[in-house]
Amino acid sequence: MPIGNPINTNDIKSNRMRQESNMSAVSNSESTIGQSTQQQQQQQQYLGQSVQPLMPVSYQYVVPEQWPYPQYYQQPQSQSQQQLQSQPQMYQVQESFQSSGSDSNASNPPSTSVGVPSNATATALPNGSAITTKKSNNSTNISNNVPYYYYFPQMQAQQSMAYSYPQAYYYYPANGDGTTNGATPSVTSNQVQNPNLEKTYSTFEQQQQHQQQQQLQAQTYPAQPPKIGNAFSKFSKSGPPSDSSSGSMSPNSNRTSRNSNSISSLAQQPPMSNYPQPSTYQYPGFHKTSSIPNSHSPIPPRSLTTPTQGPTSQNGPLSYNLPQVGLLPPQQQQQVSPLYDGNSITPPVKPSTDQETYLTANRHGVSDQQYDSMAKTMNSFQTTTIRHPMPLIATTNATGSNTSGTSASIIRPRVTTTMWEDEKTLCYQVEANGISVVRRADNDMVNGTKLLNVTKMTRGRRDGILKAEKIRHVVKIGSMHLKGVWIPFERALAIAQREKIADYLYPLFIRDIQSVLKQNNPSNDSSSSSSSTGIKSISPRTYYQPINNYQNPNGPSNISAAQLTYSSMNLNNKIIPNNSIPAVSTIAAGEKPLKKCTMPNSNQLEGHTITNLQTLSATMPMKQQLMGNIASPLSYPRNATMNSASTLGITPADSKPLTPSPTTTNTNQSSESNVGSIHTGITLPRVESESASHSKWSKEADSGNTVPDNQTLKEPRSSQLPISALTSTDTDKIKTSTSDEATQPNEPSEAEPVKESESSKSQVDGAGDVSNEEIAADDTKKQEK
């Protein structure tokens, strides 16, 4: 049967009645939260007592002060959308209506599309009240249809008053006899008479009543009779009195009834899943934040599950009222969402995860989602625009964090230290509410403009506050976070405390902010600015220290000799980082360690050695040629095995390792005689072959690659050049000599380090005879071959 038609018996418009019938169909399945017959009887009694006097008045316009509830917001949705959506629900949920025309028929087992038998009087549901989907008795149907109606008496008593206040959006159906929805006894008689007609819209009425009652409970009108208050406590404790006239349309009742009627709610959900779109009702004050139907407003789910909470349980509906905030009593505004205390500025649109889980698990009904979305909009509207002048400060990023608004949950902001080049000072900047507030490190002044921008105050008020400051420094040039009016630290702190943003800017207003930074980064004592500029472990003051003063123990240990002795020198246009390392202990791969010898610092070098170094950098290619095929050891660590070939990037098979000897004490002598040598423990091989200061590798080099001076004329000059010496085939001596020593692996045997160390000792002792003898032996070998 067309569900809406029988409702025409009422003076209400057919459209309204149709909607209401749809609502009632929905609410019947929902209200099937059956309670013990005693409770039902009690409910009926309460309803009869409190509501009957009001019954004849089906539409009373409630004074907005008394009825600030946003039911009309909610129910306009329910009507406009419920007309579309609740009708399919009607067919799904209340097949019994269609078949029998009345809920009262127990004969229709599939009362809900879910397939809950209509007779199933007691189906245990989480709320603890059995779902009495439809009882065979019409009289019982009344009570059964009532969803969690803890509040009927209240709602019904004032329903007549409240009904038409939202009338612009929806109309509250009167029972067939013209009595208000809240009058259960009359409803029962009407239903007995017209079970088909009145039952349908009675459920809708029940829904409306349910909403109104819940809202009434939430606000607990002074107008309500004390009896109503008692009914609250009783019914909330014992379980919602099931009132046939009360439809489960009120957001709380929907939630509760749907918790209990999870089955019926399942049937309802598919059509109504689109239902909760609050954006359809964008009232002037609403933010469109709740356009997402699933992001339920943080209406405290607990209040829904435990209706005993009375006003707090109503907070869900109250949140809908938010647009009318002017009408709400102050206590109600506080109650509106117990999750957010008065200080909470966070947009309530972001519910805690447990709320979401609650909503999804317990509230399957779509109308709940509808209310949730509405509540969401309302809540967001209230908390952001009404509650606090600074809507989003509670979260470090208004968009990001899911904090509940308490300062304890605020994530500590990150402090960034940057260098203000123009002012030659460091700056600490903390971002709050999307704005970076900067404090100078030298004089602790704070950018007052950005500080006040965090509060989201108007520009005029901000400028007025800043103009009142006696000490201020205006910066008009630079990056955005540096522009503005800079005020002293104390004044900035006072303003921040007055505007209640000091906590959000932690630790900007801690006097000794360096200590906080060091605590947060114990491993890195340097400020983050140094790391941001690429300089590690250097305190900010080192910006202004000469390079030579740097002491970087963490520098690379395999630094070339020239870098070590003359660290700030620019070798071949390549800037060498300044690292003065007293002792280099790196050992080339595959080489056994020699004795560690301390590097002479630059102050130990004589002036002429530095000049040698300088000339070395300019004339390096020539020096390499002049020195035979041994390139200067600039690019090698002290203990690295120096291959004449490897210096040039060529690796002939017959190259022999050249192991540097530790530094000798006669640095002056070697530096004078060795033009290209750098006193880093590596004495460059000299062209003269007879020197007693030759180290062992220089001797081997001379024997293998360079010819003593007395033989240079006999050798082709190319043999002394690095590349030709390595590649030329015309000098048999060189090839054979290197082939002899090619048998020595790159990793010298253990005997070799001893030999080399002994040779270095012989150097130090001035035992030149040994070296001369070895050279002579080598020469004889060459000549023989």
UniProtKB/Swiss-Prot annotation:
Record carries keyword Phosphoprotein: yes
Pfam families recorded: KilA-N
GO molecular function, one term: sequence-specific DNA binding
DNA-binding interval(s): 448-469
GO biological process: positive regulation of transcription by RNA polymerase II; pseudohyphal growth
Positions of the UniProt region annotated as Disordered: 1-45, 78-121, 202-355, 519-538, 642-785
Domain HTH APSES-type: 414-520
GO terms under cellular component: cytosol; nucleus
Subcellular location: Nucleus
Residue ranges with Polar residues bias: 1-12, 20-37, 95-121, 266-282, 304-318
Regions of compositional bias (Basic and acidic residues) in chain numbering: 687-702
PANTHER family, alphabetized: PROTEIN SOK2-RELATED
Family recorded in the similarity comment: Belongs to the EFG1/PHD1/stuA family.
Functional summary from the UniProt entry: Plays a general regulatory role in the cyclic AMP-dependent protein kinase-stimulated (PKA) signal transduction pathway by regulating the expression of genes important in growth and development. May inhibit the switch from unicellular to filamentous growth.
Protein name: Protein SOK2
Native source organism of the sequence: Saccharomyces cerevisiae (strain ATCC 204508 / S288c)
Phylogenetic placement of the source organism: Eukaryota, Fungi, Dikarya, Ascomycota, Saccharomycotina
Gene designation: SOK2
